[in-house]
UniProtKB/Swiss-Prot annotation:
Biological process per Gene Ontology, one example term: regulation of DNA-templated transcription
Residue spans of biased composition, Low complexity class: 338-357
Lineage: Eukaryota, Metazoa, Chordata, Craniata, Vertebrata
Biased composition (Polar residues): 16-30
DNA-binding residues (ranges): 113-209
Classification via InterPro entries: FH_FOXN3, Fork_head_dom, FOXN2/3-like, TF_fork_head_CS_2, WH-like_DNA-bd_sf, WH_DNA-bd_sf
Record keyword Secreted present: no
Name of the protein described by the UniProt record: Forkhead box protein N3
Length: 485
């Protein structure tokens, strides 16, 4: 934009002076003249040549811009009107007399254009009707009746009215009743969300003779009673519905207020096991059904895992490696260290030590038959004094051939039971482990089981002898009969 020349100076060099027909009146103020210099469209001018020399060759000083502080206020109304939702869709409306100090009167000045926009005219027409809704032709008639200027005005104003009705958000179309006979077209009413905006726009005019429109009570449900309310805009916390001002949903408002009031409780009212950083924490007073999730500290969890791994290592070192799963030192790869604890609990109960299956009894009887004496059976079932003897004993059992195929599974069960009975003594020191002897109750139970098994074995041997004798007797009788024949 180049240097701006103040209005007090004349143009240089060309000798051309600009004089305006509209800006010579004494009623105009300096801000209007300043607006003419800010690249606004110039008024019609008359150009005539004068003889003049160059008065000043220096650049124009811009300090004169700070002298007038009301520069923006002079055209603030036009700027605000450009973003208002109630402005006219058609911008062909000339400046109205409302901008001057003279009041507007349609009866005294019938040829003067009214100071209202088309949206305000439509608003006044609809609000003046008893049903708060009008067709387009009735809006035309109301404007012509109250403002005689439009009787002789060009017909383009009707197009502006139709455009405002169809494109402006302040007006909406309503279905007509069957009882009404309005012909073609539809009824138009005021959108409740923008009614206050229309009222504010109408009150900006210095004089409007139809202020009684806003004081009359409405007679239909489409009318809206409250007028002394703050203007509505997108994002406001209030909205209108059937003439009443309502807040946003009560749940959101109540929860927000309670959260603000209980901020100190949220900071100090949690247990040390609740996650507070990086998580959304709720107050128990607001949400009684929601309970915080207790989280064990990381140090305690790591200590428990470390203890479990240490116990598994000691057990695996003290026990034979035959038939037992390998336990890794890494807790991620180890999935079996928890099974040893559960097996230990099962073996510690006396009922498990007393109860044994018939397969175990038969296996014990078979070992008695293989070894050939009761002493060997008892020495085999009793606990060894040292770990080396236990290892040798298990190796011997593995090398001995099994008579039947079912004995292999029973052999594994026996080894597992022996291993579980030995687990409680592993926690003791090595010297005590060597000197420790099995409890007397276990010895008595094993003796009783051995006696019952021997009794069963004797019964079986007796039955075998009887069957053999009967078979021999039958054979002898058959032989005698054959010899006689």
């Amino acid at each position: 934009m180049g240097p701006v020349m103040p209005p007090s100076k004349k143009p240089e060099g060309t000798g051309i002076s600009v004089s305006s027909q509209c800006y010579r009146s004494s009623t105009l103020s300096n801000p209007l003249q300043d607006d003419d210099d800010l690249d606004f469209p110039p008024p019609p001018v008359k150009i005539h040549k004068e003889k003049g020399g160059m008065e000043d060759e220096e650049l124009t000083n811009l300090n004169w811009l700070h002298e007038n502080k009301n520069l923006l206020k002079s055209f603030g109304d036009t700027v605000l009107r450009s973003v208002s939702p109630v402005q006219d869709i058609d911008d062909d409306t000339p400046p109205s007399p409302a901008q001057s100090d003279m009041p507007y009167d349609a009866k005294q000045n019938p040829n003067c254009k009214p100071p209202y926009s088309f949206s305000c005219l439509i608003f006044m027409a609809v609000e003046d009707s008893p049903t708060k809704r009008l067709p387009v032709k009735d809006i035309y008639n109301w404007i012509l009746e109250h403002f005689p200027y439009f009787a002789n005005a060009p017909t383009g104003w009707k197009n502006s009215v139709r455009h405002n009705l169809s494109l402006n958000k302040c007006f909406k179309k309503v279905d007509k009743d069957r009882s009404q006979s309005i012909g073609k077209g539809s009824l138009w009413c005021i959108d409740p969300e923008y009614r206050q905006n229309l009222i504010q726009a109408l009150k900006k005019t210095p004089y409007h003779p139809y202020s009684h429109v806003f004081n009359t009570p409405p007679t239909s449900p489409q009318a809206y009673q409250s007028t002394s309310v703050p203007p509505l805009w997108p994002g406001s916390t209030f909205f209108k519905k059937n003439g009443a001002l309502l807040q946003d949903p009560d749940i959101d408002a109540a929860s927000a207020m309670m959260l603000l009031n209980s901020a100190h409780e949220l900071q100090a009212g949690f247990s040390p096991g609740v996650i507070q950083n990086g998580a959304r924490v709720l107050n128990r007073g607001i949400f009684p059904g929601v309970r915080p999730l207790p989280i064990n500290p990381i140090g305690a969890m790591a200590a428990s895992v470390r203890n479990g791994i240490a116990n598994c290592r000691t057990r695996m070192e003290s026990e034979p490696s035959c038939g037992s799963p390998l336990v890794s030192s890494d807790p991620k790869d180890d999935h079996n260290y928890s099974s040893a604890k559960s097996a230990n609990k099962r073996s510690s109960s006396p009922s498990d030590s007393i109860s044994s299956s018939a397969d175990d009894h038969y296996e014990f009887a078979a070992k008695v038959c293989r070894e050939g004496s009761d002493i060997s059976f008892q020495s085999h079932e009793s606990f060894s004094e040292t770990e080396e003897e236990d290892k040798k004993q298990i190796k011997k059992e593995l090398k001995e051939p099994l008579v039947e195929s079912g004995y292999s599974s029973q052999h594994k069960k026996k080894q597992h039971l022996l291993k579980l009975r030995r687990i409680p003594s592993d926690a003791l020191p090595l010297k005590k482990r060597r000197t420790e002897k099995p409890p007397e109750s276990d010895d008595e139970e094993m003796k009783e089981a051995a006696g019952s098994l021997l009794h069963l074995a004797g019964i079986r041997s007796c039955l075998n002898n009887i069957t053999n004798r009967t078979a021999k007797g039958q054979k002898e009788q058959k032989d005698k009969e054959t010899t006689k024949n």
